[in-house]
Amino acid sequence: NKNKNKNLYPFFFFFGVGVAFKLVQALQTRLKGLPEGQEKWLLDLVALGTVCDSVSLIDENRANVYWGLEVMKKQHRPGLKALLGVSGTKSDKIDSRTLGFVLGPRLNAAGRLKTADEALDLILSNNNKDAVKRADYLDKLNASRRVEQDEITAKAKKIAEDYQDNSVLVLSDKNWNHGIIGIVASKIMEQYKKPTFIISENEDNAVGSARSFGDFSVADAIHYAHDYIIRGGGHKVAAGVTLDVNKI
């Protein structure tokens, strides 16, 4: 954990999936009866998580993604194979964009609109027929996500027009889908070239997603605003926050 003072590991740019993989590697060396080197077959999932979490692709992260793509090309997971199939992607054309723009959005659509268990069930599926059925369902969910995302983005852009002179854009409205506001924040940030917070207002609390631009750290901004928020966290590029509606 790079945030621990006594951490002596030389690479500091892991996030969730990278730390989980290091744990697996450590267990591999300490538990008896496990074939040596078999953790490499998890690298397809490590690569997927690394790219989709917008982690810096340097050093070990870059190596994990490179070898993860090689593992994925062998298509040993029926679920990911089926998901590539419904998206029309050939195995020899897989690259980091495939992870971030083809597989990632379809897997994430489950958690954004329904439950993340749908995506997990696909990844764990060992049956080709079942995998195809689940992949088709996630593909349709992703299409629905795009429609709702476009609607929220259009409304957010309209609100942003009134705040173009602000150094940071903080845009909110009632009942925007929590699972989609992160994507909307990215799109608004890309258009206006400014750090962006997209916030969904509920009855009492508001839930927001932030995306950074330039040297601005949204995680630091949330940390410094601790007097105004209920909870929040993330990293320099992306973060989430919960606060009282009246504190927006």
Question: How would you label these PLM feature ranges?
Answer:
Residues K4-P10, F21, A47, S56, ...:
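Low-complexity, compositionally biased segments
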Residues Q28-K247:
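Hydrophobic helix-and-loop "lid/oligomerization" segment in the mid-to-C-terminal part
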Residues N1-V19, T29-K32, G37-K40:
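Hydrophobic, small-residue-rich alpha-helical packing segments that form membrane-like cores
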Residues V19-A26, Y224:
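Generic recognition of well-ordered alpha-helical segments
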Residues F15-K22, I183, K187:
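Short amphipathic alpha-helical face segments that pack within enzyme cores
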